[in-house]
Structures are given as C-alpha cells and as structure tokens.
C-alpha cells in the first residue's frame, strides 16, 4: 500500500507491514505490525503518530486493528498483546489481557478485529473467540458455547466482524465458517442462552467453499461477499440463486 502526500510528515509506505486501515470521520487510522498506529488527516495530509515515543503507556507497537468510539477512546487490538483503550484527549491507556483465573477477562490475547455496532457496543474478535466489552464494568462477556450446537465450542480465531442490514452480526472465523448472531438476542438473553447460526464448508450451493473465512462485505444491493483462505470468494446473492464461488489459481 502506498500513499504519497506532498509536504506530509511521512508516507504510509514508510510504515512497513500495514495490517489494517479504517476511516474515521475526516481521517484514516492506519495500523502497522511494528510501528504502532498512524492517523492521517485527509484534509491536511498530516500524520499523527501513536507509538511508544508519543504514548509511553502503550504496551506494544504491534497492532492488528483500531476502532474509534464516540467518547474519544481508541480501541487497539495488539498482536499477541491484548487490547488497549487509548484516550485521545490525554493519551492515557488502559490495557486488558487474558486472565485464565477470570472468566470475564479478554478471551484471547491476539486481538485481530474490533467492531462497533449501531448501538455503540464494542465487539472484540480474538484468537480464542468473541467477546463483548462492557465499558461500565471494564469486563468482557465471552461467548464460548452454543446451546444445542453439535459442533461444540465457539472459541475459533476470529478475523472479521460486520453488522449487516438485517441487524445480525456476521463473524468470519478460522475453520468454523461464518457465525451469525441476531443482536436482538443480546438484549434479552443471558450469554449462555444465546444461539448462533452458522454457514459452514460443504459441497452444496448453500455452503462455503472453505471453512476458513477472512472477510465479510455487504454491497449496496445487499449481496454478501465472503473472502476465504484457499477457497476463493464466496458470493451470497440477495436474490436466487443464493451462492456462487470464485476460485483462483
């Protein structure tokens, strides 16, 4: 990825190993594997650096993802380093990691994706499954089991979380396909009562071409595109026929 801006403090191409980029208002958050996070003001072309030099309390400069909330907090997912919540006002940091003795701690320390839904809830995708962050108590609601699910635990590595237009949360996982959560359940049921739907790997037109899903996108026509690892792109049409697969060589 390259972005050259005349007169800017740096170019994104100088930050090796970009892991993700997320638009936020009039700017762009760019996460890197080795050099923390950069914020690009698109109007001015100016970069603001968030690393150990500018934010000494930051536990690690290895980052997968970042999501900005309305309260001026930046949620940062680290490479095997847990979750950090950075106050953009005073640069204070709160850091969370997995505690095997605490069932309400972060489920896994490799935080690959963070998603803010339309109700402002913060969902965390980790190497050990899905969690919902409770800002008031600074604890995590973890989703480990699916009632009545013959496939067992929900502790898959999670790569992507998206809320689609039907108010359902679609979750791309490693080897577990797509997990689907109806967000209305979250308002009325206990975590252990919540049921997930699944789209799994199979040989029919209603299954994924590969169980390792990486990315989910819903286009303006309400079609759903799913990127997989080794199985090409899967396309779920808003109108029949439902499934298509594009392979590559």
What are the functions of these language-model segments?
Residues 2, 8-249:
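Carboxylate-rich, polar loop motifs that coordinate divalent cations or form catalytic acidic clusters
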């Amino acid at each position: 990825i390259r972005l050259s801006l005349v007169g800017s403090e740096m170019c994104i191409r100088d930050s090796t190993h970009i892991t993700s980029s997320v638009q936020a208002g009039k700017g762009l958050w760019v996460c890197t594997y080795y050099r923390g996070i950069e914020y690009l003001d698109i109007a001015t072309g100016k970069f603001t650096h968030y690393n150990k030099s500018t934010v000494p309390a930051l536990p690690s400069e290895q980052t997968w993802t970042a999501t900005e909330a309305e309260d001026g907090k930046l949620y940062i997912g680290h490479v095997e380093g847990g979750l950090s919540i950075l106050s953009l006002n005073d640069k204070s940091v709160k850091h969370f990691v997995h505690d095997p003795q605490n069932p309400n701690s972060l489920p896994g320390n490799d935080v690959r994706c963070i998603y803010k839904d339309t109700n402002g809830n913060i969902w965390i995708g980790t190497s050990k499954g899905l969690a919902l962050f409770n800002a008031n108590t600074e604890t995590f609601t973890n989703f480990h089991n699916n009632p009545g699910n013959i496939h067992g635990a929900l502790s898959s590595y999670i790569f992507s979380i998206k809320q689609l237009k039907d108010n359902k949360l679609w979750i791309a996982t490693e080897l577990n396909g797509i997990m689907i959560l109806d967000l209305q359940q979250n308002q009325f049921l206990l975590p252990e009562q919540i049921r997930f739907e699944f789209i799994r790997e199979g040989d029919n037109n209603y299954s994924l071409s590969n169980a390792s899903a990486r990315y989910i996108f819903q286009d303006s026509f309400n079609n759903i595109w799913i990127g997989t690892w080794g199985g090409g792109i899967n396309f779920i049409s808003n109108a029949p026929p439902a499934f298509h697969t594009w392979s590559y060589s």
